Amino acid sequence: MLILRTKIIKNFVIRIFFVNFAGEITIKMLRFISFGSGSSGNSYYLYTETDSILIDVGVGIRTLKKHFHNYGLRFEDVHHIFVTHDHADHVKSVGSLSSDYHLPVYTTRKVHVGIERNYCVRKKIAPNHVHVIEKSVPLNVGEFKITPFGVPHDSTDNVGYFVECEGVTFCLITDVGHITEEMHDFIGRSNYLVIEANHSEEMLQKGPYPQYLKDRILGPNGHLSNVACGQALADYASPSLRHVWLCHLSEENNHPELARKTVEQILRSKGIVAGKDFELEVLRRKTPSEIYKLV
């Protein structure tokens, strides 16, 4: 595939056009896939025709390879790994993937230490693949400009990511006890947003979990409820928001339809209509999403 040197500027966004060997012209764009979202394993993939990042590797390598093959993607085209935090459902395969494919792993120093100590990560990250990032300090990695930001959660450390690429913005906020002031800005600047809607408080309180675990989930460093997620969207989403995906739903304390309806109801109370003002979907826990074109 050859890059045409001419760049077309429209609405102040640079679009790079490609021509393949069949003479077909295609627009370079960002795409998104979720390979799993929940306590069974999390992994999110952002990619263009020439670059890519994988955020979290809590899904098994064999499973990831199968998903890549099913979507006609090359596993060898993964270029960078970013990690949100050191819980097993986000990092259990990060060492294996980094070692087997010689991939750099970006996260905070504390998360790197947590990964090193995590017994669930059987193969550790080689020192030359360890890349330390700082919260609120943007970095340029290939075609991506990425800003990590602090996320309150009871892990060693935790970050979300605000990604800028190909003229669009994408934000990931997961495993979050409460929405911080810094997140307000990133939600407001997002064209595409993945945000946690972990549980129904009613289902959690009536469920079989021991009280200490309920308190942990409901605490300021636990997980975001459906209601809190809906309130964050209603309060801070801007007209530039195009698509929202609800992520990390609890299998025991939530249902996809309940999460979506709860968020939709809160949005309607503020005059925001899902499906009209922006698209709203729920990411599946154990199976991949479709491929989304972020334009």
Regions from the language model: what does each represent?
Residues 55-58, 78-86, 106-109, 171-174, ...:
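Active-site neighborhood of phospho(di)ester-bond hydrolases with catalytic His/Asp-centered motifs
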Residues 109-159, 165-167:
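Metallo-beta-lactamase
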Residues 33-43, 85-94, 148:
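Structured catalytic core of nucleotide-sugar glycosyltransferases
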Residues 61-108:
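Active-site metal-binding motif and surrounding structural segment of the metallo-beta-lactamase
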Residues 181-281:
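Cap/insert and terminal regions of metallo-dependent hydrolase folds
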Residues 92-101, 117-119, 254-261:
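Metal-dependent catalytic neighborhoods of phosphoester/phosphodiester hydrolases
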Residues 17-71, 159-175, 192:
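Conserved beta-strand hairpin/beta-sheet module of binuclear metal-dependent hydrolase folds
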